[in-house]
Design a protein with these regions (language model features):
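Short, Lys/Arg-rich flexible segments
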Residues: 1-139
Length: 139
């Protein structure tokens, strides 16, 4: 068969398996995790684009230089973050033993990509999906 047929077969196979490729792109994607890290550490916001509450005590806020928590002390929680795709959704968490305590204190919304960062997340995944497509279909 010809090149067009080969291309069509590869294209159809890729589109048929698109969910598998998307999951592979999302799983442990550091660029996506960095969006969550940035919104926590730099913007002090949750996955709902809300400031993290409760606020720090006045004494600790004075020491940190801001009153809204950033959940960054040693960086261990940020380093231990992971992202995993599950169908049409993904889950972000951290494997540090105190992550559940932080979720109890500040809400499970500390993990996730906020609406204000969704466009960037989409761009990250779309760009990588395009690279995968070129690699697989045009090879």
């Amino acid at each position: 068969m010809g090149k067009l047929h080969d291309f069509t077969v590869k294209h159809n196979r890729f589109t048929q398996d698109i969910d598998i490729y998307v999951e592979g792109i999302i799983d442990d994607n550091q660029d996506l995790l960095n969006l969550n890290r940035e919104q926590l550490k730099e913007e002090h916001k949750t996955a709902k684009d809300q400031f993290i509450i409760p606020k720090y005590s006045k004494a600790y806020a004075k020491k940190k230089g801001f009153s809204t928590p950033d959940l960054y002390v040693t960086g261990d929680m940020f380093k231990a973050m992971s992202i995993e795709a599950k169908g049409q959704q993904f889950t972000i968490n951290s494997s540090v033993d105190y992550a559940p305590k932080l979720e109890d204190q500040y809400s499970s919304d500390i993990f996730g990509i906020a609406p204000s960062k969704q466009a960037k997340a989409k761009q990250i995944t779309t760009d990588e999906l395009g690279r995968q497509y070129k690699k697989i279909v045009y090879s």
